[in-house]
Swiss-Prot record:
Temperature dependence: Optimum temperature is 25-30 degrees Celsius.
Substrates-to-products reaction catalysed: 5,5'-dehydrodivanillate + NADH + O2 + H(+) = 2,2',3-trihydroxy-3'-methoxy-5,5'-dicarboxybiphenyl + formaldehyde + NAD(+) + H2O
Purpose: Involved in the catabolism of 5,5'-dehydrodivanillate (DDVA), an intermediate in the biodegradation of lignin. Part of a three-component monooxygenase that catalyzes the O-demethylation of DDVA, leading to the formation of 2,2',3-trihydroxy-3'-methoxy-5,5'-dicarboxybiphenyl (OH-DDVA).
Effect of deleting the gene: Mutant can degrade syringate and vanillate, but not DDVA. It lacks DDVA O demethylation activity. It cannot grow on minimal medium containing DDVA.
Protein name: 5,5'-dehydrodivanillate O-demethylase oxygenase subunit
MF terms (GO), sorted A to Z: 2 iron, 2 sulfur cluster binding; iron ion binding; monooxygenase activity
PROSITE patterns: RIESKE, RING_HYDROXYL_ALPHA
Binding-site list for [2Fe-2S] cluster: 68, 70, 87, 90
pH influence on activity: Optimum pH is 6.0.
Enzyme Commission number(s) from the entry: 1.14.13.-
Length: 424
């Protein structure tokens, strides 16, 4: 149980808040590169700030205040140029660093005045990696953008899924340190949703949480596993400060503001060895719905089930009403680490998992369950005969578009569908 003050300290992310200042020390995924194949600008809201993400005519990305500092026009309606974004209202232009480089009438009427030198727009660095676009909103110099090894994995079909959820980001991230929910939400509840009354999934017998350089792992033993199983020896990674890596996909929980978050999923499906070599030219990005046509929460897919649990806690979970147990040890570890990191940045120190040395920021390995299967692959026959459901259907989020399913089928060269976990 937390006090109301502690809860606010951990949840709220606006400029100047303790958690907001901490999260601004890290890079966050805010969109996908392929989204800009057909458009040049997109409005985004991040940690309570209204911004516009754009790709200029030179192919460079930028992120700046959504409102022009001249008369507050919407820069999302701006015109991209070779080296920046131009306001469509009066033509003022800004580069990726926020400098005003042109004021057409001012430059003509008073060329020596150089009024443009006195005007700037708020701007943040943007980088592309793994098909994602990443933003850094903290003090400079920016740390390294973590180059996780999975971003360079070969012979896999990748897709990026974005969903906007009406709840605070921390509810999503605390899920990254909660192994017991797999037993009940994804196994037992899924059976009930299928109309089954049993048997239930295997019980958890033992759990552990281990800190490492880039976050924590949760490790578990179920009735059907032992201490030699990768679920215990390797575990799954809670990546600091707001992500999870399961062994074949990333889940990022990006704060839009205090009451809204963006789930950004990056998924890798290893193609059969029969389909190698496979080179994916563009990583599709699609937006996953969270409600059906009747306005009911979607519960058929794994992450949609998670979303229901997070949203159900309220816009900002009232942690003063909690009663934590043994299964929640990881939640406590996470909260204490956030508070320690807030203290560190108040002293001018880097928080946990910041990378400054480019020499070590090269294909950084992560805890990966069933690593051999991911790296070496399986034959199409082995996949068809085996129980690896995630290689035969996209079970993680509802709403995979038909054209993305077709791309996945073409890559895998075996039958694919996008039915959910509940339909299994």
């Amino acid at each position: 149980m937390l006090s109301a003050e502690q809860n606010d300290k951990l949840a709220r992310v606006g400029p100047g808040t303790p958690m907001g200042e901490l999260l601004r020390r890290y890079w966050h995924p805010i969109g996908g590169e392929s989204e800009f194949e057909t458009k040049a600008t997109r409005p985004v809201r991040l940690m309570g700030e209204d911004l516009v993400l754009y790709k200029d005519l030179s192919g460079n990305y930028g992120l700046m205040d959504r409102h022009c500092p001249h008369r507050r026009a919407d820069m999302a309606c701006g015109m991209v140029e070779a080296d920046g974004l131009r306001c469509s209202y009066h033509g003022w232009m800004f580069d990726a660093q926020g400098a005003c480089t042109e004021q057409p009438f001012e430059d003509t009427a008073n060329p020596k005045g150089r009024y443009k030198d006195k005007v700037r727009i708020k701007a943040y660095p943007v980088r592309a990696l793994g098909g994602l676009l990443w933003a850094y909103m903290g003090p400079l110099p920016a740390p390294e953008l973590p180059d996780w090894e999975p971003f360079s994995w070969k012979n896999g079909f990748r897709q990026i899924v974005i969903s906007v959820l009406p709840c605070n980001w921390l509810q999503g991230q605390e899920n990254s340190m909660d192994p017991i929910h797999f037993e009940w939400m994804h196994a037992n509840w899924s059976k009930r949703l299928r109309g089954e009354t049993g048997p239930y999934g295997p019980k958890h017998l033992k759990i552990d949480f281990r800190e490492y350089d880039y976050g924590f792992t949760y490790n578990r033993i179920r009735e059907d596993t032992d201490e030699t199983n990768p679920l215990w020896t390797i575990g799954r990674a809670c990546l600091w400060p707001n992500a999870m890596f399961t062994g074949d996909h990333f889940e990022y929980r990006v704060p839009i503001d205090d009451e809204t978050m963006m789930s950004v999923g990056w998924f890798f499906t290893r193609v059969p060895r029969d389909a190698e070599p496979y080179v994916q030219e563009s990583i599709p990005v699609w937006h996953g719905p969270i409600k059906d046509a009747q306005g009911e929460w979607i519960t058929s897919h794994v992450m949609n089930q998670d979303f229901v649990a997070w949203i159900g806690q309220g816009t900002i979970s009232d942690r003063t009403q909690e009663n934590l147990g043994l299964s929640d040890k990881g939640i406590g570890m996470m909260r204490r680490q956030f508070l320690r990191d807030m203290e560190k940045i108040s002293r001018g120190e880097d928080p946990k998992a910041i990378i400054r040395d480019p020499a070590i920021n090269k294909a950084i390995p992560l805890p990966t369950i069933h690593r051999d299967a991911v790296m070496e692959g399986m034959t199409a026959e082995e996949i068809e005969a085996g129980g690896a459901l995630h290689l035969k259907r996209f079970i993680f989020q509802y709403g995979q578009p038909e054209h993305v399913l077709k791309m996945q089928q073409d890559a895998m060269r075996i039958s694919q569908d996008n039915k959910g976990y509940v339909d299994a």
